[in-house]
Amino acid sequence: MTQQKLYISDVTLRDGSHAIRHQYTVEQVKQIARALDDAKVDSIEVAHGDGLQGGSFNYGFGAHTDLEWIEAAASVVKHAKIATLLLPGIGTVHDLKAVYEAGVRVVRVATHCTEADISRQHIEYARHLGMEAVGFLMMSHMTTPQHLAQQAKLMESYGATVCYVVDSGGALSMNDVRDRFRAFKDVLKPETQTGMHAHHNLSLGVANSIVAVENGCDRVDASLAGMGAGAGNAPLEVFIAAAERMGWNHGTDLYKLMDAADDLVRPLQDRPVRVDRETLALGYAGVYSSFLRHSEMAASKYGLKTVDILVELGRRRMVGGQEDMIIDVALDLLKQQEHERIRSEPVSSEAN
C-alpha cells in the first residue's frame, strides 16, 4: 500500500462552500484552484456545497452559478482534473452535459447510503459523455457495512469505477471505517477503486482516512484547512503530512498546501471550521454536517440552543435534503419548552 500512488481529491471548492454559505467569489475560486493545481492534487471538486443546482431556498443560494465557478477553476488548472458533485433529483443529466462542456471530467453521483438505485441514470449518462463516474454513498454510518457494500455494488453495476464511503455526519469510528472498506473489498470487482470522504466532527477525519488507506482505499477526499460542512473535512495539509511521515506516495507538495490553507482559505472563514460544542454535536448525534449553519440560524431565530436542535435531528434520523425539517424541529422544541413551563408553574388556589 505504501508504494501505490494515492489519488488526492480536494473538496475545498465544493464541500468547503458550506462553511461560507456558498459565497465563494470567482476570483477566490481561481486563486484556490491555481494553488491546488500547483501543489499537484489529482482532482479539484467544484460546485455549490449541495452539488449541481444546489442553490435554492432549501439549501441557500450561491454567490455565483455552478458553471461560473467551474469555468473559473478550469481556466487556471493545468494538471488536476475538474470534478463536481451531483445529487439525483437536484442535478440533472442536462446539467451533466453542461458541466462536461465547461471542463468537468469527474462526476461524483451522491445518494443517501441506502438509495443507490436512484443513481443509475446519472452514472450511465456520465459514462456516455466520457466522464469518470464515482458512486458517493452519503451518511454511511446509517447502515451496516454489508448493506453499504451491496449499495456500492449497485453503483458499480451502473458503471461507477470508484465507490466511496462518505461519512457525512463525521460519526464513524476507525473500526467502522475498517469494516466498511473490508466489506467493499469483499464484493466489488478488483479493478473498482474505493474512496474515503471524512468529516472531522469527532476529530477523526485524518485518522479515519489513514485507516481507510490501510484497508485498501485508493482515493482520499480532503480540503485545505479542513474547509467544509460541520467541523470540516479531513484537513488536506494534515493528511498529507501524516501520509508523508508514513512513507506513502501521495505526489503532492506539502508546503504549498500548508501555505494555501493558511494564506488563502482560513481567512475566508466567517465561522471557524473546528470541533466545538455545535460541530461535536453533529458527530455525536450522527447528523448531516451541512445542517450546522441552518440549525444555528434556526436557534438564533427562535431562542433555542443549536445543540438541542442537532441532537433532536439525530434522534429523528434526518438525512441530507431534509433541511426544511430543521424549522419544524425548532418549533416542536419551542412547544415542548412551553408545555414544560406550564407544568412547572405552581397551581394557585383561592382562599375560602
Swiss-Prot record:
Can you supply a Gene Ontology BP term from the record?
Answer: toluene catabolic process
Q: Where is the Pyruvate carboxyltransferase domain?
A: 6-258
Residue positions annotated to bind substrate are: R14, D15, S168, H197, Y288
What this protein catalyses is: (S)-4-hydroxy-2-oxopentanoate = acetaldehyde + pyruvate
Name the UniProt record assigns to this protein: 4-hydroxy-2-oxovalerate aldolase 1
Give the family this protein belongs to, as stated in its UniProt record: Belongs to the 4-hydroxy-2-oxovalerate aldolase family.
Name its pathway. Answer: Xenobiotic degradation; toluene degradation
Write out the GO MF terms: 2-isopropylmalate synthase activity; 4-hydroxy-2-oxovalerate aldolase activity; manganese ion binding
The protein's UniProt keywords, in alphabetical order, are: Aromatic hydrocarbons catabolism, Lyase, Manganese, Metal-binding
List site positions: Transition state stabilizer. Answer: R14
Q: Name one Pfam family in it.
A: HMGL-like
Looking up HAMAP family in the UniProt record yields: HOA (MF_01656)
Xref: PANTHER family:
2-ISOPROPYLMALATE SYNTHASE 1, CHLOROPLASTIC-RELATED, HOMOCITRATE SYNTHASE-RELATED
In this chain, Mn(2+) is annotated as bound at D15, H197, H199
Concerning InterPro entries, the annotation shows: 2-IPM_HCS-like, 4OH_2_O-val_aldolase, Aldolase_TIM, DmpG_comm, DRE_TIM_HOA, PYR_CT
